[in-house]
Regions:
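C-terminal transmembrane bundle of multi-pass solute transporters/carriers
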Residues: 7-10, 88-92, 99, 115, ...
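Juxtamembrane intracellular "pre-TM" segments in multi-pass secondary transporters
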Residues: 19-40, 219-251, 435-447
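Helix-loop boundary and gating motifs at the non-cytosolic
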Residues: 25-85, 242-287
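Substrate-agnostic recognition of the 12-TM MFS/MFS-like secondary transporter fold
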Residues: 41-58, 81-97, 101-116, 133-192, ...
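Hydrophobic/aromatic positions within or immediately flanking transmembrane alpha-helices
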Residues: 44, 60, 76-79, 106-107, ...
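Transmembrane alpha-helix termini and helix-breaking/packing motifs in multi-pass membrane transporters
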Residues: 62-69, 120-126, 182-202, 273-274, ...
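Helix-loop junctions on the cytosolic side of multi-pass membrane transporters
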Residues: 154, 158, 200-228, 417-432
Length: 452
């Protein structure tokens, strides 16, 4: 096969365009700064495989609980128990991330996830799985996630450096969202043919990919913080609160977590009750959301430096609100797929820009705490979003819950965008700022703009 490919590439005539195209493709890939680092390539490859398995488990588990209980509320509680420990522990986890050997502890914590998936598979295969077992394992997984998430996020900058951080975050998000396409699609097939236990076992095996990637990372090429500086648990919050742009984005992220992202918790009920779909259709909706998010993440990974970061964040936030509001009003599967693509793309753009602005504004010795604060909001508050969306979906229907959440997100996005000058003309701040995207926030008296 290799010889055939070489022959085609080096052949003349009509096929001689390949030697001209392939270097351009290679150059485009290498232009993504984070991929120039071997350690990051190992990390992201393992992450992608593992995340595909994680999404397979997530889809199969949600559908299993829905079949066991026939309750939107009890299905949403899986997300609640998985995320509630993050609310309690992730700020502490962020402080720990600033102090520990991140590679070693990531390997330890990923091993726990492997054991949890294996336990679910054994229980399901033996016919012993019950809703209390699901809740208990979700709770234990949440405890580990409270430490794993800030450690993993803070490890990105150590692998690629601050100048390539946005592309690393975008590629990490791309892996997450591409796996959201692949995982649910595979789960729909595997769950329908082999049952949920197979999905859980596949997830357990997938963790070996990320463990191998972490093991092969060369620690000599990792730029860890050697300053020795330490800060209290409030340092991350105090830093964000002092800067106008990060403060606004944190407020907006809080609203999105409580009223926007909660749609994932009630998507199984929306698929069945509003669209008349079964597990295959639910997997298709999840994949549509993942396709949109992956498109947004890959776009920013490739050309994100060309955009004004805060403008992208706020425009994407407005698009999230509009797409969710419309999604709650439709009952046609094809239209719902299109709207979920838009919602996924917009959420990814907003999340990546927010995460990048927060991390690049933070000094090295408190970056873990800033990431911990972000995780506290995005994951720790998610149980409350899932709970309120599930309760409203139970009382008034999943369509109403999604439309209401979209309306709240839209109002919040418009208010924050207006307060941060999105609808006012920008001054000409020079060619360097236009090239790098380092624009000041107009309503910031000191012109700092949140450290972008």
């Amino acid at each position: 096969m290799y010889r055939i490919i070489r022959k085609v590439v080096h052949s003349g005539g009509r096929g001689n365009y390949l030697p001209r195209v392939l270097p351009k493709v290679r150059a485009a890939i290498l232009s993504i700064g984070a991929l120039q680092h071997r350690n990051f390539r190992l990390f992201i490859a393992g992450q992608f495989v593992s995340l595909c398995g994680t999404w397979m488990q997530s889809v199969a588990l949600s559908w299993l609980v829905l079949e066991l209980t026939n309750s939107t509320w009890k299905t949403g509680l899986v997300s609640f128990f998985g995320a509630f420990p993050v609310l309690l522990l992730t700020l502490w986890g962020g402080a720990v991330a600033d102090r520990v050997d991140k590679r070693f502890w990531l390997m330890v914590l990923q091993t726990f996830f492997l054991v949890e998936a294996l336990a679910l598979g054994i229980l399901a295969w033996a016919g012993m799985i019950t809703v209390p077992w699901v809740y208990a394992l979700a709770l234990l997984t949440g405890v580990v996630s409270a430490f794993e998430i800030p450690i993993r996020q803070a490890y990105l900058v150590e692998m690629v450096g601050k100048s390539n951080l946005m592309s690393a975050i975008a590629l990490n998000s791309s892996a997450f969202n591409l796996s959201r396409v692949v995982g649910p699609a595979l789960a729909g097939v595997v769950n329908a043919t082999l049952g949920p236990a197979a999905c859980f076992f596949i997830n357990a095996v997938s963790f070996f990919a990320v463990l191998i990637g972490l093991y092969k990372i060369d620690p000599r090429e990792v730029r860890s913080d050697q300053s020795g500086r330490r800060a209290g648990l409030r340092a991350g919050w105090d830093h964000v609160r002092a800067l106008p742009l990060p403060r606004a984005l944190v407020i907006l992220t809080t609203v999105f977590t409580l009223f926007g992202s909660a749609l994932i918790a009630i998507l199984p009920a929306f698929a069945r009750k509003a669209l008349g779909a079964e597990v295959g259709g639910y997997g298709g909706l999840m994949s549509a959301f993942g396709i949109g998010a992956a498109l947004g993440a890959l776009t920013l990974a490739a050309i994100g430096q060309r955009f004004q970061r805060e403008r992208v964040a706020f425009i994407a936030a407005i698009a999230v609100g509009v797409s969710l509001l419309l999604l709650g009003l439709v009952h046609v599967f094809a239209v719902a797929v299109v709207l979920l693509v838009v919602a996924g793309l917009s959420m990814a753009l907003n999340a990546i820009m927010t995460n990048t602005i927060l991390q690049t504004s933070a000094p090295d010795h408190i970056r873990g705490q800033v990431v911990g604060l972000y995780s506290f909001i995005v994951i720790g508050l998610a149980p409350f979003g899932s709970a309120q969306a599930s309760w409203i979906g139970e009382q008034f229907g999943p369509s109403f819950a999604i439309a209401l959440g979209g309306a709240v997100c839209l109002v919040a996005a418009l208010v924050m965008a207006w307060r941060n000058g999105l609808f006012r003309p920008r001054p000409d701040v020079g060619p360097l700022a236009r090239m790098t995207g380092e624009y000041p926030v107009l309503d910031s008296p000191d012109g700092q703009g949140g450290g972008r």
